[in-house]
Design a protein with these regions (language model features):
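A short amphipathic helical element positioned immediately N-terminal to and/or at the very start
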Residues: 153-167
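Conserved residues at the C-terminal ends of beta-strands
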Residues: 8, 35, 135
Length: 167
């Protein structure tokens, strides 16, 4: 029975000590989302190619535009849509858990679109979100999704784009 829930990739790309950086923000917000876009925190040779960095950035800005507000240049400032490393308050997650269903198709939300869904649904529920830079290491082992390959990466980018536009 925890008050804070953390999610992360299971491929060694995240460092648990970044939780010490993330958790204090929960005194001012509901969810802290990581970004892998700050170069000084990324290990050389990781899977974030130029395509991944810029694709994530532009998709993040599309979400910002979708939920734009004139206050503080928007509701959220994002640079990375695909980072699953995040922490959320238990009571905030409870506002979302009954809705892990695509409201258009009725299908459960999972897979690569899950981080997008968490972010977008949180915005719609008026949860306060902040993004913080995290350490990003080289992946241990092979990618199960093959998203580090150019064609697969483009396919994932198009899946993300479609999800953002239709959700």
């Amino acid at each position: 029975d925890a008050n804070i829930i953390a999610t992360a990739e299971a491929d060694g790309t995240n460092n648990a000590y970044d939780l010490d950086k993330m958790i204090p923000y929960l005194s001012n917000c509901d969810m802290v989302v990581g970004t892998r876009q700050v170069q000084i925190f990324t290990q050389k040779g990781n899977q974030n190619s130029i395509m991944h960095v810029w694709g994530n950035y532009w998709l993040a800005k599309l979400i910002q535009f979708k939920y734009f507000s004139l206050h503080h240049f928007g509701i959220i400032n994002l640079t990375d849509v695909g980072c699953l490393f995040r922490v959320i308050k238990k009571e905030s997650l409870e506002k979302l858990t009954d809705k892990f269903i695509d409201h258009k198709t009725g299908d459960a939300i999972g897979g690569p679109a899950f981080p997008l869904y968490l972010t977008m649904r949180s915005i719609e529920k008026d949860l306060r979100i902040v993004e913080v830079p995290l350490t990003f290491n080289k992946r241990l082992g092979q990618s199960k999704t093959r998203s580090d390959e150019k064609i697969s990466g483009i396919k994932y980018g198009l899946i993300f784009l479609k999800f953002i536009l239709r959700y």
